[in-house]
Amino acid sequence: MSSLTGKVKGRARKIKGDADIRINESTENVGLVIRVMTAVVDIKFPSGKVPKILNALESKEIYNGKKLVLEVSQHISDSIVRCIALDSTDGLSRNDEFIDTGAPISVPVGRATLGRVFDVLGNPIDNCGPLTKSDYSIKPIYSEVPKLTDQKVTTEILVTGIKVIDLLAPYLKGGKVGLFGGAGVGKTVLIMELIHNIAKAHKGVSVFAGVGERTREGNDLYHEMIESGVINLEEKDKSQAVLVYGQMNEPPGARLRVALSALTMAEYFRDVENQDVLFFVDNIFRFTQSGSEISALLGRIPSAVGYQPTLAAEMGAMQERITSTNRGSITSVQAIYVPADDLTDPAPATSFAHLDSTTVLSRQIAELGIYPAVDPLDSASQALSIDIVGEKHYEVSKEVQRILQTYKSLQDIIAILGMEELSEEDKLIVARARKIQRFLSQPFHVAEVFTGTPGVFVSLEDTVSSFKDIVEGKYDHLPEAAFYMVSNINEAVKKAELLQKEGK
């Protein structure tokens, strides 16, 4: 490779090695590109002046309309570092200069971020201009987990207005929730409904991290928040949400770090403003997937099913920061894609250990046309105990699960021999189970535009009392169809009367 001339100002010297490179000896620690492999870039610095691991490097030149930022991931020698690109490396060539910023990737935090949309580096991407400098500070995306003595455990239920969740797998304020499901079973719709139901009623701040999902969905969510008043375009400081996106089209480095950028913004509101923060992530699997891509490019030997060997450590480093402290709380709702509907896949399986509640979406239930397609038997919550939800709620939920479990165990017999071979008691259980199954469905606000059915928010008291009446047999005389897509038992009775008039 020929010597670099005309690019580097000031006194320069040659660095011995595999390339004839001239390195700047000014106050800036400048390195030169020696290798580009898609999202991974090798940079050569003066001997002994390699940047620290996780330091951000910034290009001197402009690529695709902006400066390119790299993150140091490995030290190859005493002068060469291997970096992850946080944007496209199109146009990058050998001998291009990068400056060591001397610090990790940092993002803006503070009230100036409210109502804005950011990328992984904290740059506004909503065409609303730069941030007001007086209203924000800069914070690195890496921070320590709160000390055990500073953490706080809460036992307060977070009411979502969604019957199947509130009854069978309730969420805790300050807890971590996982929405598990395969492709196309309704994870994003469910998380958007939760944002609609919780964020609107929530007095604190909501932070949304779009990790490797569709740009269209991010755009839809932004406009949904504007329409609902969660984001106020006229007076940004009255907004209640911050959006941080690293979408599907972006390189793996951006998708890997965007969750940490969003989490850093959420931590500010918890630790400095002492607020209760809602933290939504869609999708945690893409966080794992991008880590796997980077790991392969860095030359690490893959672990089980091709995932990175550091999967558990990366997941733990992020999840342990999502916690409640004496100053405030972070309640996290995370959508988690399940590859091939296999919950034992290492990516979703690694997430289980960190969660307080798991909501599992089932393709079999979706095929029945029951939405949300939550599996009432696979979903679970640590909050479902007498001490937290009370005796009435606990007993009703356990009876609902018992009836559904019995129905599930009888399905093979029904398929082979038919309903006629069942005992009268089993026939009654099957009839109630089918009513319960349909009553667990509910129209969503965010799906109104597609279904034409107005969405409903069901109070916890209505949910518990309605299911109590069903399991006690008070409404055995109503047809199954009356229980489908209604809010409470009174609506089911009205629907049954309407169906009778129509002769159905």
From Swiss-Prot:
Keywords: ATP synthesis, ATP-binding, Cell inner membrane, Cell membrane, CF(1), Hydrogen ion transport, Ion transport, Membrane, Nucleotide-binding, Translocase, Transport. It is an enzyme of class 7 (translocase). InterPro entries: AAA+_ATPase (IPR003593), ATP-synt_VA_C (IPR055190), ATP_synth_F1_bsu (IPR005722), ATPase_a/bsu_AS (IPR020003), ATPase_alpha/beta_chains (IPR050053), ATPase_F1/V1/A1_a/bsu_N (IPR004100), ATPase_F1/V1/A1_a/bsu_N_sf (IPR036121), ATPase_F1/V1/A1_a/bsu_nucl-bd (IPR000194). It is a peripheral membrane protein. The keyword Ribosomal protein does not apply. GO terms for molecular function: ATP binding; ATP hydrolysis activity; proton-transporting ATP synthase activity, rotational mechanism. Gene3D superfamilies: 2.40.10.170, Bovine Mitochondrial F1-atpase, Atp Synthase Beta Chain, Chain D, domain 3, P-loop containing nucleotide triphosphate hydrolases. PROSITE patterns: ATPASE_ALPHA_BETA (PS00152). Its main location: membrane. SUPFAM superfamilies: C-terminal domain of alpha and beta subunits of F1 ATP synthase, N-terminal domain of alpha and beta subunits of F1 ATP synthase, P-loop containing nucleoside triphosphate hydrolases. It catalyses: ATP + H2O + 4 H(+)(in) = ADP + phosphate + 5 H(+)(out). It is found in: Cell inner membrane. Its EC number is 7.1.2.2. CDD domains: ATP-synt_F1_beta_C, ATP-synt_F1_beta_N, F1-ATPase_beta_CD. Belongs to the ATPase alpha/beta chains family. PANTHER family: ATP SYNTHASE (PTHR15184), ATP SYNTHASE SUBUNIT BETA, MITOCHONDRIAL (PTHR15184:SF71). Produces ATP from ADP in the presence of a proton gradient across the membrane. The catalytic sites are hosted primarily by the beta subunits. F-type ATPases have 2 components, CF(1) - the catalytic core - and CF(0) - the membrane proton channel. CF(1) has five subunits: alpha(3), beta(3), gamma(1), delta(1), epsilon(1). CF(0) has three main subunits: a(1), b(2) and c(9-12). The alpha and beta chains form an alternating ring which encloses part of the gamma chain. CF(1) is attached to CF(0) by a central stalk formed by the gamma and epsilon chains, while a peripheral stalk is formed by the delta and b chains. This is ATP synthase subunit beta. The gene is atpD.
